A protein has these predicted regions:
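Extended basic (Lys/Arg/His-rich) segments that typically form rRNA-contacting surfaces
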Residues: 2-224
Length: 224
């Protein structure tokens, strides 16, 4: 199978989305007067900074930039990339895999219209960091006896066997850094798109703290 056919097959499920900044949570009311908890996401100007194709890059995608940046905060390579295409400087660059790169050109703006007629979305962001945590909080382990004589209130217990295999099995759930990792929440209801104010309202919570960037794309899987 050629690279082009492989990429076109993969590209069938690829879709364009938007990048926004998590503002916080609030609630709105529907026609029946029921309160709906929503997360408000603010979308800044998003511009196509590069178009990639199977012929030149091995896959089809568009690179977009958002959040204006000062020159002193960018590397020489990044500054050269923007200058080459006569673009403003952007702090955040991200790719979206698409199967129709010929429909885009450098400098195009990504509008909220990409979410028109969309009911469910997948939201990806970096979860809130919790620091170093033990197994009870990190992995929901059961605790030991809490009596006065107990010596293993919240200890993890055995982490392996003895002489055989003489090592700790890779992937063993142990204490360590919790959070601050890429998380995707799928099939969230898209409650409202306020194009006039560049706001998106999504039902429920999304990953990350207030002010952190998240990616919103139409749900690609079947949903009920």
């Amino acid at each position: 199978m050629s690279a082009s056919s492989r990429m076109s097959r993969k590209g069938k499920n690829m879709t364009l989305g938007v990048i926004g900044k998590k503002v916080g949570m609030t609630q709105i009311f529907d026609e029946q007067g029921l309160a709906i908890p929503v997360t408000v996401i603010k979308v800044d100007e998003t511009v196509v900074t590069q178009v990639k194709t199977v012929e030149t890059d091995g896959y089809n995608a568009i690179q977009v930039g958002t959040i204006a940046a000062k020159e002193k905060h960018l590397t020489k390579a990044e500054l050269g990339h923007f200058k080459k295409n006569s673009l403003n400087n952007y702090r955040h660059l991200q790719e979206f895999r698409v199967d129709n790169p010929q429909d885009y050109k450098v400098g195009d703006k990504i509008e909220l219209s990409v979410l028109d007629n969309v009911e469910k979305v997948d939201v990806t962001g970096k979860s809130i960091g919790k620091g170093f945590q033990g197994t009870v909080k990190r992995w929901n382990f059961g605790r030991g006896p809490m009596g006065h004589g107990s010596k293993n209130h919240r200890e993890p217990g055995s982490i392996g066997a003895g002489t055989t295999p003489s090592r700790v099995i890779k992937g063993k759930r142990m204490a360590g850094n919790m959070g601050n990792e890429r998380v995707t929440i799928s099939k969230l209801k898209l409650v409202r798109v306020d194009a006039a104010n560049n706001l998106i309202l999504v039902k429920g919570s999304v990953p990350g703290c207030e002010g952190r960037l998240v990616t919103i794309v139409p749900t690609r899987t079947k949903w009920n």
